[in-house]
UniProtKB/Swiss-Prot annotation:
The protein, known as: Dual-specificity RNA methyltransferase RlmN
Source organism: Hahella chejuensis (strain KCTC 2396)
Encoding gene, per UniProt annotation: rlmN
Coiled-coil region(s): none
Keyword Heme in record: no
Listed InterPro entries: Aldolase_TIM, Elp3/MiaA/NifB-like_rSAM, Methyltransferase_A, RlmN_N, RNA_MTrfase_RlmN, rRNA_lsu_MTrfase_RlmN/Cfr, rSAM
Cofactor(s) needed by this chain: [4Fe-4S] cluster
C-alpha cells in the first residue's frame, strides 16, 4: 500500500537516480544495483531483509525511504486467462492494469495517468476526466504487483510478463518524465530486463513530445490513429485539431530514423460501426500509410454504458482487414479479451469507483455525419 509522503519512495527510481540518492547518504554508487536486485529480481520491499547491506545502512534507509506500491483493491481473472487489477493510490484515486496471455507471451497493459484529458470520443477513460499524472513509482508499482502475483522474478526462466504496453489509462506523453523513467527501470538488466522491442509506448499524437521521446529512449512506438482522414479524426481524437495526421506521420518517420535497428510503428485503429469501418475507410487507410513501416492493429470497439457507439459486425471487420492484407500490410484483428471482467481500458475502475460521468461527455452516434467518401462532421 502507498506509504507516507514524508519518505522517499525508491520504487520507480532509475539506476542514475538511485546512485545519486545513495551518494547523498555518503554511500557508494554500487548500492543502487544492490537495491534494484532486491526490489526487482527478488520482489523484496523490506529493508531489513536486504542482508548484503550493513545494519547501519538499513536503519538509515528505514528513516528516510521506503519501497511502496499501490494497494490492490480488486483483482479478477477472466475465463480466457486475462487478469485485471484495480489499484488504489495515495489520495484515494484508482487505476487499472491488465495482463493478457496470448500464444506463448504475456502482455501487461499499464496506466500512466489517473483519467485522461484528451477526451477521445470512444474512450471510456476519457469520460472520467483527468485527475493527475502517475509517479514513476506508481507506474512501476503496477509491474511489481504483476510480477509478485506470478512470482515472475527469475530473469533466467520463462516469464509470464514478456511484453509491456503503455495502453492503459492516460496519455503517456503527457506524463513524459515519469514514463521515461519507468521505461528505464523496465529495460534495465538490474530492473525488469524487458527488451526495448517488447516495451511499447502508445500516443494519440503529441508531436513535440514524440520528437523528444526519440531523443531520450528507443522503446517501440504505437500511435492511436483510429481514422484515415483529418475530418473524422478531429471528431474521434480531438488532439488531431492541433497535430493533424500529416504531422503525426512525419513525426513517426523521424522517430524510426533515430532508432539503431529496423522496427515498425504499430498503428492502432478502433473500428466503430457506421463511423470508420467501411471499405472506403479501409482503402483510405491503405493509401495513407503506404510509406510508413508499420503493422496495423484493428480493434473492434468494446462498448461501455452510454458510449453512443457500437461494435462492427465480424464481416465488416474482416472486409476491412482484407483490404489492408491484400495491399501487403500486416493487419491483425485484436481478439476481444476479458469481457467477463470488464477488461477494456477504463471500464472496471469506473464501475468499482462508481464515479464516471460518461453521459455528459460522449458524442452520440446519431450526431456524427459520415459522408460517402468517409469524411465526418458533428
Amino acid at each position: 500500500m502507498s506509504g507516507s509522503s514524508a519518505k522517499i519512495n525508491l520504487l520507480g527510481m532509475n539506476r542514475s537516480d538511485l546512485e545519486t540518492f545513495f551518494e547523498s547518504l555518503g554511500e557508494k554508487k554500487f548500492r543502487a544495483t544492490q537495491l534494484m536486485k532486491w526490489m526487482y529480481h527478488l520482489g523484496v520491499s523490506d529493508f531489513d531483509l536486504m542482508t548484503n547491506m550493513s545494519k547501519a545502512l538499513r536503519e538509515k534507509l528505514k528513516e528516510v525511504a521506503e519501497v511502496s506500491v499501490p494497494e490492490v483493491i480488486y483483482e479478477d481473472i477472466s475465463a480466457d486467462g486475462t487478469r485485471k487489477w484495480v489499484m488504489r493510490l495515495a489520495g484515494g484515486n484508482s487505476i487499472e492494469t491488465v495482463y493478457i496471455p496470448d500464444n506463448g507471451r504475456g502482455t501487461l497493459c499499464v496506466s500512466s495517468q489517473i483519467g485522461c484529458s484528451l477526451d477521445c470520443s470512444f474512450c471510456s477513460t476519457g469520460k472520467q476526466g483527468f485527475n493527475r499524472n502517475l509517479s514513476s513509482a506508481e507506474i512501476i508499482g503496477q509491474l511489481w504487483i504483476a510480477a509478485r502475483s506470478f512470482g515472475d522474478y527469475d530473469l533466467s526462466k520463462e516469464r509470464y510478463v514478456t511484453n509491456i504496453v503503455f495502453m492503459g489509462m492516460g496519455e503517456p506523453l503527457l506524463n513524459f518524465d515519469n514514463v521515461v523513467r519507468a521505461c528505464d527501470v523496465m529495460m534495465d538488466d538490474f530492473g525488469f530486463g524487458i527488451s526495448k522491442r517488447r516495451l511499447t509506448v502508445s500516443t494519440s499524437g503529441l508531436v513535440p513530445a514524440l520528437d523528444k521521446l526519440g531523443d531520450v529512449t528507443d522503446v517501440s512506438l504505437a500511435i492511436s490513429l483510429h481514422a484515415p482522414n483529418n475530418s473524422l479524426r478531429d471528431v474521434l481524437v480531438p488532439v488531431n485539431k492541433k497535430y493533424p495526421i500529416e504531422e503525426l506521420l512525419a513525426a513517426c518517420h523521424r522517430y524510426l530514423g533515430k532508432l539503431s535497428d529496423k522496427r515498425r510503428i504499430t498503428v492502432e485503429y478502433t473500428l466503430i460501426a457506421g463511423v470508420n469501418d467501411s471499405e472506403t475507410h479501409a482503402h483510405e487507410l491503405r493509401d495513407l500509410l503506404r510509406d510508413l513501416p508499420c503493422k496495423i492493429n484493428l480493434i473492434p470497439f468494446n462498448p461501455f454504458p452510454n458510449s453512443g457507439y457500437e461494435r462492427p459486425s465480424r464481416n465488416a471487420t474482416l472486409r476491412f482487414q482484407k483490404v489492408l492484407s491484400d495491399a501487403g500490410y500486416v493487419a491483425t484483428v485484436r481478439t476481444t479479451r476479458g469481457d467477463d471482467i470488464d477488461a477494456a481500458c477504463g471500464q472496471l475502475v469506473g464501475r468499482v469507483e462508481d464515479r464516471t460521468r460518461r453521459s455528459q461527455k460522449y458524442i452520440p452516434l446519431q450526431n456524427i455525419n459520415v459522408s460517402p467518401d468517409g469524411r465526418a462532421s458533428v
